[in-house]
Amino acid sequence: MSCYLITGGAGFFGTVLKQHLLKQGAECVSIDLEPDSFQHPRFTAYQGDINDDSLMEKIFSVHKPEAVFHCAALLAHVKKDLKRLWHANVDGTRNVYDFALKYGVKKIVFISSNCLWAKNFDSPVTEDEEPNPVEIYGKSKLEGEKILLSQPDKINSIIFRSPTIMDEGRLGLLGILFEFIDEGRKLPMVGDGTNRYQFIYAKDLAKACDLALAADYSEIFNIGADDVKSFNEVYQYVINKSGSGSR
């Protein structure tokens, strides 16, 4: 039976991912700063910090994971203490990587971000565009990528540059807009509605993580949809499906 370690396993995507992997018959181990009430006979949760060497030593020595899904990160809105964000996202990634090296882990799957480029491009950004993040969160993710790709002959690292992750229970601002549609209210719009913003369905990202296990190489993937709808199109689709009188 395969055993996988999920950092940030009590978080939104970590929870979706562990449920997916458990359905595939795997054993899952989680480490997260927050407590994890999820229960399953093949799941073990540890509450703690990925920078805690003694805890990481225990997890790796006891469970000997075959692969690590590195989902743990402090998010961009944690700006009151930028050193804390950097310590979690960069030093934490380095610690995960070092323990994976020490215990012979052959695969790390890293949930990075698509916010690695500056704003206000005159044309669409391609995969060939050199990352140039302007915010501390994007900079920390890019630094994490560099760490994980530093020794590809020892560990295969698959990196997913993911857009905003959504699923039931995490709709963000769209949840409010969907309530407006349900109530038939007029929808607020930034600009003329032709702007596009990419999301990814959490279960689709979990499937991608599963597929990454088969890769015997290191690579960066910008993951998302080929056809990104405008906000006008998204709103109109939901309005039509719900039979709402919103506009």
Q: How does the language model describe each region?
A:
Residues 3-24:
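N-terminal Rossmann NAD(P)H-binding glycine-rich loop of SDR-like oxidoreductase domains
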Residues 41-52:
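Rossmann-fold cofactor-recognition segment
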Residues 50-88, 102, 116, 122:
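NAD(P)H-binding glycine-rich loop region in Rossmannoid oxidoreductase-like domains
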Residues 51, 84-95, 131, 135, ...:
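Glycine-rich NAD(P)-binding loop of the Rossmann-fold in SDR/ketoreductase-type enzymes
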Residues 95-136:
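Conserved Rossmann-fold NAD(P)-dependent oxidoreductase catalytic core, especially the SDR/UDP-sugar
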Residues 132-158:
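Active-site Tyr-X1-5-Lys
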Residues 151-197, 202-206, 238:
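NAD(P)-dependent short-chain dehydrogenase/reductase
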